[in-house]
């Protein structure tokens, strides 16, 4: 097996988990979703990120029994945080798994990631989709868990990362789910889809191909000019022992903010092209008074062979910067050790 010093594989049900799990005195972090987006999530299991990742079939949510069994194996007694992308199947199944785990005496909190500014509702979601901020939340919260954050403090940090992150993507070609044997959608050779979802969901607008600089400007300005997004989400209240509705509002990006810039390949775009996007993004951020203090560039959330990219901007404070810089050792992301 690849990376035997970092991860183990559990079959029936399927999930990947840390070789040293459970880690004594540490809150465990579990995430997951449909396959086809590698290295997310399995490539981010290891020191400083996830304790376990649960893969579904291609573009299909994992089932509750996967998350339940993963939680049981990685739980050290300090509780488990589920980081959940906002897709209807993921939300439903992670919620069910959390309820099942609580019945077995495991403390579990779920935090939703809903950072895609392209559309409010889509084929797979109610509300905004969870995309690029997911990886950033897994890294930052993973480091905080290693530092000894308790479950409630870790959930609050994850929620803070989510509301401060915004993403948007573009597709130049479709992707082909193996079981379907045909492209998820059709695009002309001279067309692109702005605001595409990671499963090929329709975006904000289809238009003629533009230059890399023009595409970057479309994405970046959509993110930067996104203001006061409010929504109601459901979270577990440990005091009341029930699911409750809470109101969230994303703070607006403003002059002087420090941000992490994440330029991501959708899978079919070569890494040599991504710095072109980053160069223009850096220029736009400078003009808007945003200071890029950290960056991540590469194929971290893919959509099979789709050609395209996405941009994520995360407004950072000192706490997030500290945990972003902290050591990490996973198959898909590592530094500092």
Question: Which residue stretches match the model-derived regions?
Answer:
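Short glycine-rich or small-residue beta-strand-to-loop segments that form or flank ligand, phosphate
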Residues: 27-34, 50-53, 79-88, 95-98, ...
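Glycine-rich phosphate/diphosphate-binding loops and the adjacent beta-loop-alpha structural elements
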Residues: 182-274
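C-terminal non-catalytic interaction/assembly regions of soluble proteins
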Residues: 242-337
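Short Gly/Thr/Asp-enriched flexible loops that form oxyanion-binding sites at enzyme active sites
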Residues: 91-105, 124, 273-279
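N-terminal amphipathic/basic leader segments beginning at the initiator methionine
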Residues: 1-29, 318, 326-337
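Short, acidic/small-residue loops that bind anionic groups at enzyme active sites
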Residues: 53-58, 102-124, 289-291
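Glycine-rich oxoanion-binding loops at beta->alpha junctions
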Residues: 46-77
């Amino acid at each position: 097996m690849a990376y035997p010093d970092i991860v183990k594989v559990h079959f029936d049900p399927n999930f990947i988990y840390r070789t040293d799990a459970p880690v004594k005195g540490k809150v465990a972090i579990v995430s997951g979703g449909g396959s086809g987006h590698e290295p997310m999530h399995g490539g981010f299991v290891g020191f400083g990120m996830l304790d376990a990742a649960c893969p579904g079939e291609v573009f299909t949510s994992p089932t509750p029994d996967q998350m339940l069994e993963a939680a049981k194996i990685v739980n050290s007694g300090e509780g488990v945080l589920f980081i959940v992308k906002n897709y209807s199947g993921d939300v439903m199944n992670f919620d069910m798994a959390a309820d099942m785990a609580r019945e077995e005496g495991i403390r579990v909190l779920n935090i939703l990631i809903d950072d895609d500014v392209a559309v409010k509702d889509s084929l797979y979601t109610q509300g905004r989709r969870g995309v690029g901020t997911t990886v950033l939340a897994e890294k930052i919260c993973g480091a905080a868990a290693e530092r000894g954050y308790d479950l409630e403090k870790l959930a609050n940090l994850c929620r803070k990362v989510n509301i401060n992150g915004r993403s948007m993507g573009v597709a130049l070609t479709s992707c082909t789910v193996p079981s379907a044997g045909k492209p998820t959608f059709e695009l002309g050779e001279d067309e692109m889809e702005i605001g595409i979802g990671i499963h090929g969901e329709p975006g904000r607008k289809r238009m003629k191909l533009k230059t890399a600089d023009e595409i970057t400007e479309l994405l970046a300005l959509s993110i930067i000019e996104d203001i006061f997004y409010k929504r109601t989400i459901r979270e577990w209240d440990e005091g009341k022992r029930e699911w409750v509705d809470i109101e969230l509002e994303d703070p607006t990006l403003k002059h002087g903010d420090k941000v992490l810039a994440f330029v991501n390949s959708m899978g079919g775009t070569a890494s040599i092209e991504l710095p072109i996007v980053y160069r223009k993004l850096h220029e736009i951020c400078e003009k808007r008074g945003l200071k890029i203090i950290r960056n991540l560039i590469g194929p971290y959330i893919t959509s099979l062979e789709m050609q395209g990219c996405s941009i994520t901007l995360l407004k950072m404070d000192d706490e997030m910067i500290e945990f972003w810089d902290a050591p990490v050792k996973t198959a898909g992301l590592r530094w500092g050790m």
